[in-house]
């Protein structure tokens, strides 16, 4: 995992924590081990899971797991290319409709939201995006399996595209 230590440091600082404060929240870790992890790429997965949990960091989770929310492999749906394409179009429309209703003008953090806005974001926007994420993963799996595309090649092309556009500055993360 390239630059994961740097991301860990950024996320710890974003939460306003010192290395010692973070170490105090994770049994078995010390300030010096946190320092070592932040300057390295070798962080054991079990510790990474603890960092994600304690820091409640969607960025770390995305960097480590490739997703913020895990998408289940649904086993009671039609996974044919046409069925998944149609479901994808339906989920895209529902997500677009939810996003169009979302007003984020002058909304930068949780203090800027009232309870109704928080509930709307959770129930109507984030849950809908989870549905779309699951659907898009199943659609991709269906297309890749049925039409014999190479997953590694798709990932490589996507990473290269993100680098060309300037969205990735160094390495993968």
Sequence positions of predicted segments:
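DNA major-groove recognition helix of helix-turn-helix/homeodomain DNA-binding modules
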Residues: 46-62
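Helix-turn-helix/homeodomain-like alpha-helical modules used for DNA recognition
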Residues: 68-134, 141
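DNA major-groove recognition helix of helix-turn-helix
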Residues: 26, 37-38, 55
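Residues that mark the N-terminal boundary/hinge immediately upstream of a DNA-recognition element
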Residues: 7, 18-19, 44-47
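A short, Lys/Arg-rich alpha-helix, primarily the initiator
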Residues: 1-13
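Short, charged recognition helix plus adjacent turn
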Residues: 64-87, 154-173
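Short alpha-helical DNA-recognition segment
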Residues: 16-33
């Amino acid at each position: 995992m390239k630059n994961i230590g740097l991301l860990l440091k950024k996320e710890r600082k974003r939460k306003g924590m010192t290395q010692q404060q973070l170490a105090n929240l994770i049994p078995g870790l010390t300030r010096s081990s946190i320092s070592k992890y932040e300057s390295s790429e070798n962080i054991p997965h079990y510790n990474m899971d603890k960092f994600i949990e304690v820091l409640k960091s969607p960025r770390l989770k995305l960097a480590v797991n490739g997703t913020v929310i895990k998408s289940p492999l649904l086993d009671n749906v039609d996974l044919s290319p046409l069925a998944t394409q149609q479901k994808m179009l339906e989920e895209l429309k529902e997500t677009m409709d939810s996003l169009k209703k979302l007003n984020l003008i002058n909304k930068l953090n949780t203090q800027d939201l009232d309870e109704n806005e928080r509930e709307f974001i959770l129930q109507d926007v984030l849950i809908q995006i989870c549905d779309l994420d699951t659907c898009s993963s199943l659609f991709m799996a269906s297309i890749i399996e049925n039409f014999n595309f190479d997953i590694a090649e798709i990932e490589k092309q996507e990473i290269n595209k993100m680098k060309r556009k300037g969205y990735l500055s160094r390495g993968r993360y």
